[in-house]
């Protein structure tokens, strides 16, 4: 059983959904980003979704773009990120770890080389944000070769054929987007999504985690009530880092408290 299947099975047994925070590796510095991961896990994060800083993040709003800029300012490179991933994996051997990246980051290392590096660092899944499921073949082949789950986005306006492909080609979990546009806590998730979740279920898709605009516990409760296996929150987490990174101790406390509140909302 892969790490995500184990996670969902364990959570189902105690009637909980998953809460998965997203942060950018290297934000605000490589060492502080390790402390941030510790705070997220201490707060109850069920899995991690992590970014590698990229200069043109087309799916991201200003908050996560700012995280990438801070990571660049601290001279964080992709190699640094893989080193951080290895350290996170060594510390948390059972925690599902996913990467959310852009195609250029994968391509510049050659697709096989990138996924091999992910395997060596202990990464469980990769979502390539700017590669739609219809164009995923070389990425999916490399992921399968190195035992990495391929995560695909189920768009809110996706037709049945797209959702069927997401279901058939994806593994680990399905990233269900609650609204069109870019990431950002400023624009709330657009409910309801129960119709999309039901369609994905009919196609035997991996469990759906709802993302984009998830910033408060009520939205986590709504996502789980609609049938999602959990929720992903990125911009709201990164906003705490943006606001408080000059005071690391306070920032880490706020991050832990935020995750505790979001995780508490996953009780079914």
Curated annotation (Swiss-Prot):
- What reaction is this protein's catalytic activity? (1S,2R)-1-C-(indol-3-yl)glycerol 3-phosphate + L-serine = D-glyceraldehyde 3-phosphate + L-tryptophan + H2O
Q: What intrachain disulfides are recorded?
A: none
Q: InterPro entries, alphabetically?
A: Aldolase_TIM (IPR013785), RibuloseP-bd_barrel (IPR011060), Trp_synthase_alpha_AS (IPR018204), Trp_synthase_suA (IPR002028)
Domain of life here? Bacteria
The membrane-spanning stretches of this chain are none
- EC number(s) in its UniProt entry? 4.2.1.20
GO MF terms held by the record: tryptophan synthase activity
Keyword Amino-acid biosynthesis listed:
yes
State what this protein does: The alpha subunit is responsible for the aldol cleavage of indoleglycerol phosphate to indole and glyceraldehyde 3-phosphate.
Family statement drawn from the similarity comment of this UniProt entry: Belongs to the TrpA family.
Q: What is this protein called?
A: Tryptophan synthase alpha chain
What phylogenetic lineage does the species belong to? Bacteria, Pseudomonadati, Pseudomonadota, Gammaproteobacteria, Aeromonadales
């Amino acid at each position: 059983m892969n790490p995500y299947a184990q996670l969902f099975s364990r959570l189902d047994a105690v009637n909980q959904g998953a809460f998965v925070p997203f942060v950018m590796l290297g934000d605000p510095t490589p060492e502080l980003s390790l402390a941030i991961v510790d705070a997220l896990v201490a707060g109850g994060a069920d899995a991690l979704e992590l970014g590698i800083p990229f200069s043109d993040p087309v799916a991201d709003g200003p908050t996560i773009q700012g995280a990438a800029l801070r990571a660049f300012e601290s001279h964080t490179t992709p190699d640094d990120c893989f080193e951080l991933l290895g350290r996170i994996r060594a510390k948390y051997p059972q925690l599902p770890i996913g990467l959310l990246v852009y195609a250029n980051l994968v391509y510049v290392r050659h697709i096989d080389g990138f996924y091999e590096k992910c395997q060596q660092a202990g990464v469980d899944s990769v979502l390539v944000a700017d590669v739609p499921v219809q164009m995923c073949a070389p990425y999916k082949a490399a992921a399968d070769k190195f035992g990495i789950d391929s995560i695909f986005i189920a768009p809110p306006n996706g037709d049945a054929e797209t959702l069927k492909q997401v279901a058939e080609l994806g593994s680990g979990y399905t990233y269900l987007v609650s609204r069109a546009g870019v990431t950002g806590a400023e624009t709330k998730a657009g409910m309801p999504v129960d119709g999309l979740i039901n369609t994905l279920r009919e196609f035997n898709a991996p469990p759906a985690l709802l993302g984009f605009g998830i910033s408060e516990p009520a939205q986590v409760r709504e996502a789980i009530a609609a049938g999602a296996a959990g929720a992903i929150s990125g911009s709201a987490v990164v906003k705490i880092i943006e606001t408080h990174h000059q005071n690391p101790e306070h920032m880490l406390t706020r991050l832990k408290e935020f995750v505790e509140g979001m995780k508490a909302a996953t009780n079914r």
